[in-house]
Swiss-Prot record:
It holds the Pfam family Allantoicase. Keywords: Hydrolase, Purine metabolism. Pathway: Nitrogen metabolism; (S)-allantoin degradation; (S)-ureidoglycolate from allantoate (aminidohydrolase route): step 1/1. Utilization of purines as secondary nitrogen sources, when primary sources are limiting. GO terms for molecular function: allantoicase activity. Belongs to the allantoicase family. The keyword Hydrolase applies. This is Allantoicase. It comes from Xenopus tropicalis.
Length: 389
């Protein structure tokens, strides 16, 4: 069990942890600078996979740890690193995971942020840094950014040791600005296993021409998961990830439904006649007119759904604010069919052209329903950005 969430002003933890991890290595997040990487490099902070512990495994510098761990500080100051977000955007919360760092965790952290231009970054690529501290040249590159003056998104606050019942600490952020880089400060030294940055990607849509075809649902373009019925094996936010899924864990997968019939039957089109289904609701990065859809079950060879349908609606931000507290996303959502019930197949991409779509108007939200259960790796909604009517 996680430690009780630490909340401030902003979204509750239960909402922001459904959002995208803007700093994950799988979406391009990377560490540009770290004061020290003695026991374990800062790059481990951004790994997508959960941290692991290997008893008895040591490097030439000390115990092998799956996280960022600095040396015991014996000089003035504290340790910190600079992280470049893989997807710039609006940040709603942080998660600091100290798992397995029990007697060596960082007792306090703070987080600062900046919105930088590419030409402001002058760091050389980091190589294998274990056992080292930052060089004079690396400090010079860091000093140019004046990161100590960046905006504080999280003031200094305490973490908890990396035991199973206390390793996760959550912090919400009340900021509407777009950020590209973070400075993670640890006080004074120690280790953190993972650092997640929950938020919504934000791109400059003003540069997009009316006839530019875009994936309106992609996390890079600001798509975000708002809710779902089940995420037993994989979260539906993975549906809008970058590129094709790397494995089954990089998709949305539900548990097997217990209400499925003892003997399955199908109609003449091969659609299973089952009572149950699973769903996920997502918000497009920009309202738009969808022209074709891609449903990808890559890697799901024995556990893909039998069928999928997609409903859509158009909501202004004010309307969305008024209805989003309905946990089933039914009250206040005027759902209309976008894609009727369609059979899908294991480990394949299914393309649906415009002529097969049931709705040809601007939409802002979609509800993806699969039956009876199973896994989908990606959903792409290709179309043209348009303002809401």
């Amino acid at each position: 069990m996680s430690a009780p969430p630490k909340e401030n002003i902003g979204l509750p933890v239960s909402e922001f942890v459904q959002m995208n991890n803007l700093a994950c290595e799988s979406v391009g997040g990377k560490v540009l600078f770290a004061t020290d990487d003695c026991f374990a490099p800062a790059e481990n902070l951004l790994k997508k996979k959960d941290p692991e512990f290997k008893p008895g495994l040591f490097t030439e510098f000390g115990k092998w740890m799956d996280g960022w761990e600095t040396r015991r500080k014996r000089i003035p100051g504290h340790d910190w690193c600079i992280i470049e977000l893989g997807v710039p955007g609006i940040i709603h919360g942080f998660e600091a995971d100290t798992r397995f760092f029990t007697g060596n965790y960082a007792p306090r952290i703070s987080v600062q942020a900046a919105c930088l231009k590419p030409e402001e970054i002058t760091f050389q690529p980091r190589k294998d840094k274990i056992g080292t501290a930052a060089s004079i040249e690396e400090y010079k590159s860091a000093d140019k950014l004046k990161s100590e003056k960046w905006s504080h998104l999280l003031q200094m606050t305490e973490l908890t040791p990396g035991y199973a019942e206390s390793s996760h600490s959550y912090f919400n952020v009340n900021s509407k600005q777009r950020w590209t880089h973070l400075r993670l400060n640890i006080y004074p030294d120690g280790g953190i296993a993972r650092f997640k940055v929950y938020g919504i990607g934000q791109r400059d849509w003003s540069s997009c021409k009316p006839n530019d075809l875009e994936d309106l649902l992609s996390m890079v373009n600001g798509g975000v998961c708002l809710g779902f019925s089940d995420a037993h094996y994989g979260h539906p936010r993975n549906l809008i990830g970058i590129g094709r899924a790397c494995d089954m864990g990089d998709g949305w997968e539900t548990a097997r439904r217990l209400d499925r019939p003892p003997v399955l039957k199908a109609d003449s089109k091969g659609i299973l006649q089952v009572p149950g289904f699973e769903w996920a609701v997502l918000k497009l990065g920009h309202p738009g007119l969808v022209t074709h859809i891609e449903i990808d079950t890559n890697h799901f060879k024995g556990n893909s759904p039998n069928s999928c349908k997609i409903d859509a609606c158009a909501l202004t931000p004010t309307e969305e604010e008024g209805v989003k507290r309905d946990e089933r996303f039914e009250i206040g959502y005027n759902w209309k069919p976008l894609l009727s019930v369609t059979q899908i197949h294991p480990h394949k991409r299914r393309y649906v052209e415009s002529t097969s779509l049931a709705l040809h108007q601007v939409i802002s939200h979609v509800k993806i329903t699969i039956a009876p259960d199973g896994g989908v790796s990606r959903i792409r909604l290709w179309g043209f950005p348009r303002p809401l009517p």
